């Protein structure tokens, strides 16, 4: 059967989310019969495969594909070569998608052949109804917390540097190739940069909406931000054009603390400079926490104050580590 849209969903131990994700794909306004849905799995040791195969027995166009490389960029490439559909939509198992998500993505590509990737707004949901899960969801709406990415805070259609869970015409894959398989994270940053360099545009449409489940604990949030930061460090050797100012601010913050602390041990004036910088940061932290808590509830004031610092430091420290561990990527294409 000839499908019009290849839907690629990378997974690894997603038994808690994959059924809801597949249900949101099945319920799309875009004709489900025209979709080739591929769950490309990196070796899950939970019930992910069992759940997907149950869906596959009910729907002939849902299939499970093994990903020996485990990481998401490899999953994307496997999905692309296993389908002939002219449009490719890369979804995330951790997310749900509004009923018209795929329909509007495909319409965006069909309306302008210069668009190489189209996506939309990502609403952050708490993993569960705990204090830290809700705090993390609130933090993701703060410019101070995460930065100013259009897909988090944008309200107007625009051409941007990147979008999550994007849709691509197959011609993009044929022209620029697949995602880099040596990047476990930030592969989308590098891929979107390559798309733009090839003459295509990346389009953000706020009417295209997905909902993503944030990490449930402070530790899990810090681990995720550390990994995200490490991937930015790797991009120094791969494609510096895909790194924006918002990616660099946590690095500058952490380097400032480290250098300031070292200099303070030898030169007294740097003690005051370090303290002044930290006071300024924590003042901004408190103001951002206060404003968010005023809107969402005062019980979030202290958790937000703590989480802002922890995720910023984790991201910045991860970037430093990534800068040193990413040297092996320097000469790879």
Question: Where are the regions that the model predicts?
Answer:
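N-proximal low-complexity "stem/linker" segments adjacent to membrane-targeting elements
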Residues: 1-27
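Cell-envelope/extracellular polymer assembly enzymes that use nucleotide-activated donors
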Residues: 3-6, 36, 190
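A conserved acidic beta->alpha catalytic loop
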Residues: 41-50, 69, 92-96
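Glycine-rich, basic loop-to-helix element that forms the pyrophosphate-binding segment
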Residues: 67-83, 104, 160-163
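Short aromatic/hydrophobic "clamp" motif used to bind/position activated sugar donors
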Residues: 88
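Conserved donor NDP-sugar-binding/catalytic core segment of glycosyltransferases
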Residues: 100-134, 138, 209, 213
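A recurrent flexible, glycine/aromatic-enriched loop bordering the glycosyltransferase active site
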Residues: 124, 146-171, 184, 190, ...
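Catalytic donor/gating beta->alpha subdomain of glycosyltransferases that bind UDP-sugars
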Residues: 180-243
């Amino acid at each position: 059967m000839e499908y019009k849209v290849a839907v690629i969903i990378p997974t690894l131990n997603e038994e808690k989310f994959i059924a809801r994700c597949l249900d949101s794909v099945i319920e799309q306004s875009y004709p489900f019969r025209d979709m080739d849905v591929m769950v490309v799995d990196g070796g899950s040791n939970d019930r992910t495969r069992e759940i997907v195969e149950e869906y596959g027995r009910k729907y002939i166009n849902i299939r499970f594909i093994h990903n020996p490389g485990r990481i998401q960029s490899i999953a994307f490439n496997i999905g692309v070569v296993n389908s002939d559909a002219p449009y490719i939509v890369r979804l995330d198992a951790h997310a749900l998608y509004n009923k018209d998500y795929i329909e509007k993505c495909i319409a965006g590509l069909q309306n302008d052949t210069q668009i190489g990737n189209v996506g939309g707004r990502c609403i952050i949901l708490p993993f569960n109804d705990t204090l830290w899960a809700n705090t993390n969801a609130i933090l993701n709406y703060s410019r101070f917390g995460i930065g100013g990415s259009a897909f988090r805070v944008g309200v107007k259609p625009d051409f941007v540097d990147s979008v999550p869970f994007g849709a691509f015409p197959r011609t993009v894959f044929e022209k620029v190739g697949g995602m880099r398989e040596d990047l476990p994270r930030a592969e989308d940053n590098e891929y979107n940069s390559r798309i733009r360099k090839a003459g295509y545009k990346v389009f953000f449409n706020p009417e295209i909406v997905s909902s993503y489940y944030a990490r449930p604990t402070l530790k899990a949030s810090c681990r995720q931000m550390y990994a995200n930061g490490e991937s930015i460090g790797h991009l120094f050797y791969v494609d510096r054009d895909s790194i924006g100012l918002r990616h660099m601010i946590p690095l500058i913050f952490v380097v400032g603390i480290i250098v300031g602390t070292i200099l303070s041990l030898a030169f007294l004036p740097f003690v005051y400079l370090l303290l002044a910088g930290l006071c300024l940061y924590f003042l901004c932290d408190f103001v951002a926490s206060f404003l968010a808590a005023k809107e969402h509830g005062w019980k979030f004031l202290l958790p937000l104050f703590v989480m802002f610092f922890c995720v910023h430091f984790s991201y910045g420290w991860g970037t430093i580590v990534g800068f040193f561990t990413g040297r092996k990527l320097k000469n790879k294409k």
